[in-house]
Amino acid sequence: MPISQKNQNFIDRTFSIIANILLRIIPTTSGEKEAFAYYINGMSAQSEGNYAEALQNYYQAMHLEMDPYDRSYILYNIGIIHTSNGEHSKALEYYCRAIERNPFLPQAFNNMAVICHYRGEQAIQQGDSEIAEAWFDQAAEYWKQARTLTPGNYIEAQNWLTITWRSK
């Protein structure tokens, strides 16, 4: 096993142990603890590439979790899975739902921008420059929002915004 994979496994195990300890000591309701357990199980399955299992856990967590901020991260992770599966429309829907609950989620804005940029590239390949420009404009708006929330991050996005005259 490569060293980086060993490190990742160690980090995943350490995170799981710490999460279980926190579940026991932090004063929360049993529903909140159960929601968090499903969320952790979802993250574990997702990191192993078991997307169907991860989605089941995330949906259970969504059913139990009432806090909008915590729900935003569940929705965000569901979006990541749909992105990984090439289900971009579903991914965009989940990223939007995450942002509705937590407008300070730059990674969701970034992922939405990446999908829009990808769709713009697809439109160019299909010879539809007007649709491509609309997708690129939308990508630019999402990247601007991500960069506003985390100045100094998403440097490649900033470079793209600059060279395409979309930075303002």
From Swiss-Prot:
Gene3D superfamilies: Tetratricopeptide repeat domain (1.25.40.10). Its main location: plastid. It is found in: Plastid membrane. PROSITE patterns: TPR, TPR_REGION. Pfam families: TPR_12 (PF13424). InterPro entries: PSI_Ycf3_assembly (IPR022818), TPR-like_helical_dom_sf (IPR011990), TPR_rpt (IPR019734), Ycf3/AcsC/BcsC/TPR_MFPF (IPR051685). SMART domains: TPR (SM00028). One of its GO terms (cellular component) is thylakoid membrane. Keywords: Membrane, Photosynthesis, Plastid, Repeat, TPR repeat. It is a peripheral membrane protein. GO terms for biological process: photosynthesis. TPR repeats lie at residues 35-68, 72-105, 120-153. Essential for the assembly of the photosystem I (PSI) complex. May act as a chaperone-like factor to guide the assembly of the PSI subunits. PANTHER family: CELLULOSE SYNTHASE OPERON PROTEIN C, TPR REPEAT-CONTAINING PROTEIN MJ0263. Belongs to the Ycf3 family. This is Photosystem I assembly protein Ycf3.
